[in-house]
Amino acid sequence: MSEKILKYPGSKGNIVSDLIQLLPVHKVYLEPYFGSGTLFFCKEPAAIETINDMDSDIVNLFKVIRDAPVSLANSLIATPYSREVYDNSYEYRENESDVQKAVKFLTKCWQGYGSRGCASKVGFKTDISKREKMYAV
């Protein structure tokens, strides 16, 4: 599996191998609580797959990854790692595109720390050792 793009509360990353062994052979797969999608992306594909999440930021992010990956990547490359950008990522505007919303969501997740679900503002990451991962999309 490639580098995950989203650290998210409740991620199954540490136990995904065990969970995959417990999955029965299946033709239909439903993931009602998608989150970071760790299990979905690690398991074998099924003929019919449905994913969902109550968090509209998660749903929007993965729609943008599916529908406009180049636009998202270009926007992320142009996004500076700064406290100002991080603070502004919590301000949503009505006329923002789905790509802009996805960039803001990832900015909160990547540049912040201690935020539950990347939704509540706790703090800005000042360490630079992992900063380059933000630009690895």
Question: Residue spans of the language-model regions?
Answer:
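Active-site phosphate/pyrophosphate- and oxyanion-stabilizing loops and adjacent acidic/basic residues
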Residues: S17
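SAM cofactor-binding core of SAM-dependent methyltransferases
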Residues: Q21-E91
